[in-house]
């Protein structure tokens, strides 16, 4: 059981960062424009955290 959990956990952890990194690039321009027009660029930092939760 522990052996299966080790690879599974590692895969999920490694897959999480890259998957999130890939999402921001394509969505960054859209969010950047919306955030910039809605408020200051500081919102981008706050929205970035929201994206991760989403």
Swiss-Prot record:
Induction annotation: Expressed approximately equally in exponential and stationary phases (at protein level).
Pfam families xref list: YmjE
Domain of life: Bacteria
Protein name, UniProt field: Protein YmjE
Organism whose genome encodes this protein: Escherichia coli (strain K12)
